[in-house]
Amino acid sequence: MREVRSGESSARSEIDVDKDSAMPKYVIEREIPGAGKLSSQELKGISQKSCGVLSKMGPQIQWLHSYVTGDKIYCVYIAPNEHMVREHARQGGFPANRVSEVASVIDPTTAE
């Protein structure tokens, strides 16, 4: 990160994040039979457990969000390395069947 000095373009934010210095983003595939049928209370409990482990591990690893499907949960994390993502899963007792580093993010604006 670098601070934008006075006199630089006012269209820029106060802090400009250099793409090369950003931490990697990971997608974690967790095989959990019946995940799509978990109650809101069960999902809350899983989320609380994850957040508890994250608070012990420190600010370098962050959970962004998760997608719950029929038998899997796909979680998106920011972390310095895959080992830290797998350590979070180990400490929380969560499966981490596949951990993939995100190479790029595209959306409809990519086509413009």
Regions inferred by a protein language model and the residue ranges of each:
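Short beta-strand-to-loop capping motifs
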Residues: 30-32, 76-80
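Short, intrinsically disordered, mixed-charge
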Residues: 48, 52, 56, 87-94
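A short linear hydrophobic-aromatic micro-motif
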Residues: 59-65, 98
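Amphipathic, hydrophobic secondary-structure cores in small proteins
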Residues: 63-74, 85
